[in-house]
Amino acid sequence: MEVSQSQLDLKIKYLKLKRINELNDKLRDELQRERITASNACLQLIAYTTSTRDYALPTLWGYPPADTNHFRDFQTQHADDATCCTIM
C-alpha cells in the first residue's frame, strides 16, 4: 500500500509540473506577440478607411470605372435576352 501511495504522489506531482510548464509556454507565447496601443490601432484603422476605396459607398468614393466592373459587361451582353436564366 505504501508503494502505490508514493507512486500516486509522484504521478500527481508530475501532472502538476506538466500543467505549470504548459502555462509557462502559453505565457511565453503571449509575451512574444506584437502589441500596439489602442490609439495607434485607431490611427491605423482611420488611415486604412480613408485610403482604401470602397465602391459600396458611392456618395463618398463615386462609382468604379466602367472597365473594372465585370458585372456591368455581363449585364449589357445579356440585356436583350427575355429569359431569367440560361441552361447549359
UniProtKB/Swiss-Prot annotation:
Lipidation (S-palmitoyl cysteine): 84
Propeptide: 86-88
Modified residues (Cysteine methyl ester): 85
Location(s) in or outside the cell: Membrane
Pfam families from the UniProt entry: G-gamma
Main localisation: membrane
Lipid-attached positions, S-farnesyl cysteine: 85
Keyword Membrane: yes
Example of a GO cellular component annotation carried by this entry: G-protein beta/gamma-subunit complex
GO MF terms, alphabetically ordered: G-protein beta-subunit binding
Recorded topology in the membrane: Peripheral membrane protein
Keywords from the named record: Lipoprotein, Membrane, Methylation, Palmitate, Prenylation, Transducer
Top-level lineage group: Eukaryota
Gene Ontology biological process terms in this record: G protein-coupled receptor signaling pathway; pheromone-dependent signal transduction involved in conjugation with cellular fusion
Keyword Membrane: yes
Quaternary structure annotation from Swiss-Prot or TrEMBL: G proteins are composed of 3 units, alpha, beta and gamma.
Assigned protein family: Belongs to the G protein gamma family.
Protein name: Guanine nucleotide-binding protein subunit gamma
Organism per entry: Candida glabrata (strain ATCC 2001 / BCRC 20586 / JCM 3761 / NBRC 0622 / NRRL Y-65 / CBS 138)
